[in-house]
Amino acid sequence: MAEQAASPASLDGWLALLEQRHGQRVELGLERVAAVRARMQAESDAVVITVGGTNGKGSCCAMLEGILLASGYRVGCYTSPHLLRYNERVRIDGRDADDAALVAGFAAVEAARGDTALTYFEHGTLAAWQVFAAARPD
């Protein structure tokens, strides 16, 4: 049995590992992501709103986040890509997730994925799911 390498201790370490690991070939479909998410046992009863389309997703998310926060809800928001720092992608109650929360999220995904290959985006999305499950948004 191959010994598993130690997980990075920093957010920069995780991002570098994921960039290095990501291959040129991407398998389409959500089956791999769903399987890893189920193994993570990061359950959440939060309402999920998906915003898609070509233009205006960031503005729409910012507006929804602002409305929900002003209404007293606990809100998680996941967007991509980031502008300056990876932390911008994952927000809890209008604040960027801290490095420690993201590192814990990446580690949880890594522990659950086994031999399942994930892209940079998929790993990051599942890490965000873990951060949200821990934060318990409405």
Give the ranges of each region predicted by the language model.
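Short functional linear segments
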Residues: M1-G53, C60-A62, G66-S71, Y78
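ATP-dependent carboxylate-amine ligase catalytic core
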Residues: Q24-V26, L30-S44, A70-D138
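Short active-site-proximal "capping" loops at secondary-structure junctions
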Residues: N55-K57, H82-L83
